[in-house]
């Protein structure tokens, strides 16, 4: 029922990531972005995973479960993590006592229509696809 901040450092035997292309307005849907994302499979990569574990009840505010990103020490490899193997790692975990959500105050944000059904489907597909 808690949020956790996570940091994992070491040499990853294997790490699989993905990264979307840069997009301009009008922004495509998350499902459209997934069609053109790049998939990366790295081996023996030294670097750091950072991310969060969010409780399932926060789905919609965040992504329930683990949401992790990777960057190699030399800054040439990275992306959203969906799989990794590591033998020796330093793992750091923090349990924040507070959660603050700050919403944009722009006119554009005020006017946007968010379809929750579509949003939940897109997030589920994005987090479960490779």
What is each residue range found by the language model?
Residues 47, 56, 76-77, 88, ...:
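Mature extracellular or lumenal effector domains of secreted proteins
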Residues 1-61:
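Long, positively charged binding patches that form subdomain-scale interaction surfaces
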Residues 4, 47, 66, 79, ...:
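A broad, low-specificity signal marking well-ordered, structured residues that form hydrophobic/aromatic
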Residues 22-24, 67, 85-86:
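Short, solvent-exposed amphipathic alpha-helical segments in soluble enzyme
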Residues 7-9, 18, 50-53, 69, ...:
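Residues in well-ordered beta-strands of folded domains
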Residues 113, 122-130:
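Mature, function-bearing regions of proteins
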Residues 63-71:
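Histidine-centered divalent-metal-coordination microenvironment in nucleic-acid enzymes
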Residues 72-114:
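A hydrophobic, small-residue-rich beta->alpha segment in the mid-to-C-terminal subdomain
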């Amino acid at each position: 029922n808690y949020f956790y901040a996570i940091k994992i450092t070491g040499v990853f035997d294997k790490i699989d990531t993905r990264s979307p292309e840069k997009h301009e307005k009008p922004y495509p849907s998350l499902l459209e972005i997934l069609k053109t994302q790049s998939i990366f499979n790295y081996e023996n990569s030294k670097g750091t995973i950072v991310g969060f574990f969010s409780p399932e009840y926060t789905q919609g505010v965040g992504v329930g479960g683990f949401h992790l990103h990777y960057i190699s020490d030399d800054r040439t490899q990275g992306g959203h993590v969906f799989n990794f193997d590591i033998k020796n790692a330093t793992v750091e975990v923090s349990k924040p006592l507070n959660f603050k959500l700050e919403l944009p105050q722009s006119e554009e944000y005020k006017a946007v229509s968010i379809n929750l059904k579509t949003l939940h489907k897109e997030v589920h597909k994005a987090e479960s696809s490779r």
